[in-house]
């Protein structure tokens, strides 16, 4: 009994201890679950806060558009108050350059950060690659800006010109998609557009249409991070689109002006098909009206951002695919409207403006030389996505995001250019142009000869400078060219070449067809 009696308290003790132990375990487990939930909520909050702090992105790209047409770049004839205001609210680059003369290669470079000898898009895409039976996305193997932003949680929308293949279907992370079946513009009214994977005739003035869809996309996605690629097909400046009468709101005013900002220089012998447009007031007025039409669209986009309270949290970039000569140096058009193909400044120079209130220096004019291939690393660094830049293929672009914040960084003043059989390197004072299986090569002292009329390539006193620049050019392409797409060394091209006869070993690359 004594043992029994003595055992009873022990049993009670063991039972109580077990109960306490079980209760303790339950409490600890509950506390741990609570802590995990709290940590998850806090982490989620931090992630949401981080996502909210990452700005929306609006990239506005125009087509065949020289920076010289804008008031903020000194033009006194053409009305561009909204783009001028954007420049006042951000940083304008006075020396920004395209790396090619035509639409598809420059757009491919802008979105990938790669040169044509790396991405394979050497000339503009013909219809068969855009909506025909052989259509495919020429950028599908690369990490592009929209694809990276999509993967980072952005909703991505395209309104306007694509011209990079398989136009009928949304590409590269875009979910909102309205575009043109082809790259070239035969006009701005009653044109075919692609919407909901179908082609239809659109009566709306195309510049207004792209703006309207840009606004629609912003409003639909105002509560989440978004990326809008607003790619106008104006001002364009070429073909039948310039023969079309002015119909936008600048018609009456512009038909009375003479636009002295368009040079009336003697047409140079290398003009291929537009030399007689120099000084043609009908063409000049139409081009000017289309520039101002784009400016109206920019104003509407900016007003929408402000009305929705999104302006401070939206990075806006304004640029063009490549420049255009409106008579400068005796040419009209781009570097593909000459024979031989050329690399003159009027085809390279483009507008470039970055703006985000409170984040980017306002009213700054930055004179450093930058190229369109520099935008890729700059944008991704600015957004905190530098770790998403692929290590391969190596990209030639440099990050100038600190400059947007007002900081000084080391910077080599040079840019590179590649258009089929033409490669060039440009510094502040010099430009060296080399041609593959064609002549002449060219050397210009730009500070003395800004119109690039006096070729010094055979001048003995500049041989050392020529050799230095040639070495720079050769080293650049030796470092970055991908043998698969390097047409100077037997590579392929995703586009038909204008200079195909010079590249007998190069053929049009077409991938295996895919089911759609």
Regions found by a protein language model. Give the residues of each.
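Histidine-centered active-site microenvironments of extracellular/periplasmic hydrolases
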Residues: 170-180, 238-247, 303-362, 368-371
């Amino acid at each position: 009994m004594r043992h029994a009696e003595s055992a009873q308290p022990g049993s009670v003790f063991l039972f109580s201890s077990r109960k306490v132990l079980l209760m303790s375990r339950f409490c600890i487990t509950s506390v741990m679950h609570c802590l995990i939930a709290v940590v998850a909520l806090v982490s989620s909050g931090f992630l949401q806060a981080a996502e909210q702090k990452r700005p929306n992105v609006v990239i506005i790209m125009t087509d065949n558009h020289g920076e010289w047409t804008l008031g903020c770049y000194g033009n006194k004839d053409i009305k561009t108050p909204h783009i001028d205001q954007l420049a006042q609210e951000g940083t304008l680059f006075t020396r920004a350059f395209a790396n090619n003369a035509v639409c598809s290669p420059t757009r491919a470079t802008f979105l990938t950060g790669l040169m044509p000898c790396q991405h394979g898009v050497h000339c503009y895409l013909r219809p068969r690659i855009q909506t025909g039976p052989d259509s495919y996305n020429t950028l599908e193997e690369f990490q592009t800006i929209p694809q990276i932003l999509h993967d980072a949680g952005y909703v991505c929308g395209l309104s306007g010109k694509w011209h990079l293949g398989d136009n009928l279907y949304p590409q590269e992370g875009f979910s909102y998609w309205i575009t043109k079946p082809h790259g070239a513009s035969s006009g701005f009214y009653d044109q075919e557009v692609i919407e909901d994977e179908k082609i239809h005739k659109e009566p709306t003035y195309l510049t207004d249409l792209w703006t309207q869809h840009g606004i629609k996309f912003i409003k639909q996605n105002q509560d989440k991070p978004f990326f809008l690629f607003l790619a106008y097909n104006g001002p364009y400046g070429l073909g039948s689109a310039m023969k079309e009468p002015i119909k936008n709101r600048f018609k009456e005013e512009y038909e009375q002006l003479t636009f002295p900002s368009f040079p009336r220089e003697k047409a140079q012998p290398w003009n291929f098909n537009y030399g007689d447009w120099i000084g043609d007031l009908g063409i000049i007025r139409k081009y000017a009206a289309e520039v101002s039409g784009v400016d109206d669209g920019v104003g509407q986009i900016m007003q929408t951002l402000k009305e929705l309270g999104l302006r401070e949290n939206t990075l806006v970039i304004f640029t063009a695919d490549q420049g255009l000569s409106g008579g400068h140096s005796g040419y009209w058009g781009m570097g593909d409207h000459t024979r031989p193909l050329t690399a003159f400044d009027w085809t390279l120079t483009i507008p470039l403006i970055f703006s985000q209130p409170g984040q980017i220096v306002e009213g700054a004019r930055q004179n450093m030389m930058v190229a369109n291939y520099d935008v890729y690393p700059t944008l991704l660094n600015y957004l905190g996505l530098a770790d998403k830049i692929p290590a391969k293929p190596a990209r030639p672009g440099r990050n100038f995001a600190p400059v947007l914040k007002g900081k000084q960084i080391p910077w080599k003043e040079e840019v590179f250019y590649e258009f089929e059989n033409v490669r060039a390197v440009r510094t502040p004072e010099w430009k060296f142009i080399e041609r593959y299986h064609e002549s002449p090569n060219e050397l210009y002292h730009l500070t003395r000869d800004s119109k690039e009329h006096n070729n010094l390539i055979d001048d003995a006193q500049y041989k050392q400078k020529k050799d230095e620049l040639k070495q720079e050019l050769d080293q650049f392409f030796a470092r970055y060219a991908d043998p698969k797409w390097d047409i100077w060394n037997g590579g392929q091209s995703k586009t038909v070449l204008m200079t195909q006869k010079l590249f007998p070993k190069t053929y049009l690359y077409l991938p295996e067809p895919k089911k759609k």
